[in-house]
């Protein structure tokens, strides 16, 4: 069996275990291994195959749950940065405007007092960011886990 030690693949396998069980996770891991030494083309091919697998085997809600758990970090550093803007602002609207004026890695959109839209302007994922092709939207759902981690702080 090929080596499966890439962090992206390990997170996907763990998420599959938690969401749909060991059998499906093991099936995925055996069929789609990814080594941490994989080059950018191999990583992109793996990400595309992962999206195809998810879309062929699960409904949209389950794909959302699986990918959401594949986030790359806990969001603490971004949460701390956002908190600095929030603590200096007199209102949510001011917080959003100040953040957007000074930061470019993400954008905020004020919806209401209890809702803010958080958006990355591009994909920062090491599996896909340097390949000039696009993936299914399923790949992007990990950002929901990132945003959840950021705002949980």
Predicted regions located by residue number:
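N-terminal accessory segment detector
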Residues: 1-135
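Active-site helix/loop of acyl-thioester processing domains in fatty-acid/polyketide metabolism
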Residues: 137-152
């Amino acid at each position: 069996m090929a080596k499966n030690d890439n962090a992206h693949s390990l997170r996907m396998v763990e998420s599959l275990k938690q969401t749909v069980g060991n059998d499906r996770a093991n099936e995925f891991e055996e069929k789609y291994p990814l080594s941490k030494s994989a080059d950018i083309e191999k990583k992109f091919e793996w990400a595309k195959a992962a999206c195809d697998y998810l879309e062929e085997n699960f409904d949209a809600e389950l794909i959302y749950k699986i990918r959401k758990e594949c986030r790359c970090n806990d969001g603490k550093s971004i949460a701390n940065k956002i908190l600095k803007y929030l603590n200096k602002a007199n209102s949510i609207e001011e917080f959003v405007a100040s953040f957007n004026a000074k930061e470019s890695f993400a954008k905020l959109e004020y919806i209401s007092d209890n809702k803010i839209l958080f958006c990355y302007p591009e994909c920062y994922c090491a599996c896909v960011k340097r390949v000039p092709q696009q993936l299914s939207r399923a790949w992007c759902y990990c950002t929901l886990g990132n945003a959840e981690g950021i705002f949980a702080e």
